[in-house]
């Protein structure tokens, strides 16, 4: 069942960090942690990665018994993100039986010339997300511990409304914690998908 759909532009700066840096970061911001929760992403594409070739990401995310189908497409700055809220039954059918959810995202994928019957979950990634109040109402800071295909990595993300400004803010935050800032252009999806044999 389709519940609703929304579109927005996602602009974020990200940096992959070591486990020790992750622990240092959480210690530094321990009094500013606002929420911590688990989320699981199920990444969808065709066996021959037709969506990836177009620069498009597609996933189902489960957070606290809430399920969202998301399509991300590149823009000149940031990503166009289309979200479609789905129920658990629809999510399970997509993940377990490759039955793609009805709705605008399905229609968009079909317009790209992709047969939705070829789409299936190829990888999944579980994240322990810690959200931090960084004192800036224009940004959203989080620290993620990600587990996928036997790999664990750690990442800082800062969402904002202008890419260069957001990167500069994240560099400042990293510097404050003694973390070397190295821009991470690889999304969680590309990292998880790169482990597929």
Regions from the PLM with identified roles:
Residues 1-197:
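Phosphate-end processing signature that detects enzymes handling 5′-triphosphorylated RNA
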């Amino acid at each position: 069942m389709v519940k609703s759909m929304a579109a927005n532009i996602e602009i974020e700066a990200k940096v992959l960090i070591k486990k020790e840096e992750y622990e240092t970061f959480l210690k530094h911001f321990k009094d500013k942690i606002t929420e911590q929760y688990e989320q699981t992403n199920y990444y969808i594409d065709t066996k021959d990665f037709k969506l990836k070739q177009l620069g498009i990401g597609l996933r189902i995310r489960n957070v606290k018994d809430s399920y969202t189908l998301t399509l991300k497409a590149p823009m000149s700055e940031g990503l166009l993100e289309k979200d479609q809220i789905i129920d658990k039954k629809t999510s399970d059918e997509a993940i377990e039986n490759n039955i793609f959810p009805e709705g605008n995202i399905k229609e968009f994928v079909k317009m790209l010339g992709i047969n939705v019957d070829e789409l299936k979950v190829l990888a999944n990634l579980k994240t322990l997300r810690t959200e931090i109040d960084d004192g800036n109402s224009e940004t959203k800071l989080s620290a993620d511990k990600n587990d996928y295909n036997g790999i664990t990595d750690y990442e800082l993300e800062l969402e904002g409304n202008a890419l260069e400004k957001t990167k500069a803010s994240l560099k400042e935050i990293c510097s404050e914690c003694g973390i070397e800032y190295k821009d991470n252009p690889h999304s969680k999806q590309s990292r998880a998908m790169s482990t597929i044999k």
